[in-house]
Amino acid sequence: MFDSIRFLNEGKYDDITTTYRYFANAKIVAAHGLPRYCFYRHSGNNSSAATKHHLLNPVQLNEYLAAFRERTEYISKILPQLAGLALYSEWSYMISMVEKIHRYGLNNCADLLELMCDNLRAHWDDFYNGKYILEFEKVWMDRYVK
């Protein structure tokens, strides 16, 4: 499996484009409740915007959005029983970024903000009335997308 699923040569966030593929293609997955995946996040780390919100930029956000789109398509094909959850996860990421852009005044992401809001509006019924959405996501949808 590790020979056929490789890290990409382009992009900065290789784990978001590969890790789910390992799980989706594994014959057996064991879970025991203890975190085993960790990394050191320093000021120059590619994903430092996850905790230092002012660092979020359109290039990073666009790469993440593309990775979520690709993941939704891949999981829907390989594990169709998880298609709804994968789609929810993509929309959940979008609404979390919409909220973050508003809260931190990230005007450099205005174009992607509009794109995400348009996408969420187009799928309002499926996301807002879906079985996975959390209450705070509904609040954010009402506040930022409606």
Predicted regions and their residues:
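Amphipathic alpha-helices of TPR/Sel1-like and other helical repeat/solenoid scaffolds
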Residues: 63-74, 116-121
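Membrane-interface aromatic/basic loop that binds lipid-linked glycans or pyrophosphate carriers
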Residues: 101-146
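Residues within HEAT/ARM-like alpha-solenoid scaffolds
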Residues: 59-66, 81-89, 111
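Amphipathic alpha-helical repeat scaffolds of TPR domains
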Residues: 85-99
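Secondary-structure edge/capping motif, primarily at the C-terminal ends of alpha-helices
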Residues: 43, 50, 75-78, 98-105
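Conserved nucleotide-sugar donor-binding catalytic segment
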Residues: 1-56
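Flexible helix-coil transition and linker loops at the boundaries of alpha-helical arrays
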Residues: 74-86, 129
